[in-house]
Amino acid sequence: MNYIHYIIVTVAFLLVGGTNAVAQTDRNWIRQGNRAFKSQKWAAAETQYRKAIYKNQKNPQAIYNLGCALLAQQKDSLAMVQFGNAAQLESNIFRRSKSYHNMGVVMQNHREYAQAIEYYKMALRCNPQDNETRYN
């Protein structure tokens, strides 16, 4: 009787442990999204970044990367929302400047030059050394 009980408990622990090994973290989803993005598989990257955000809604890197994937697919209005969210959540000013820079790029592409300049100024306030933003 004890032997059967021991086997049942052991199998239960193995099953529970196995599901934890399969569970993905938001960082893993971001890495998968980055691989897809580098391969120019924008829709696949978008899916992976959305999975990362589902795991952790407060991850500014996942949100920023989602914005980049959306921008690559020419989904500018959705990308703007993601860049804005990433800028609000990001504590690192250099990464925050990237969000503002990309918002400026979107506005410039839509010929909203005054708005683009404001976003570029915000990016430069965060990172005055960013020559690409200064050039735009």
Predicted segments, located by residue:
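Short coil turns that delineate tetratricopeptide repeat
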Residues: 57, 91-94, 128
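TPR alpha-solenoid repeat register
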Residues: 62, 96-99, 133
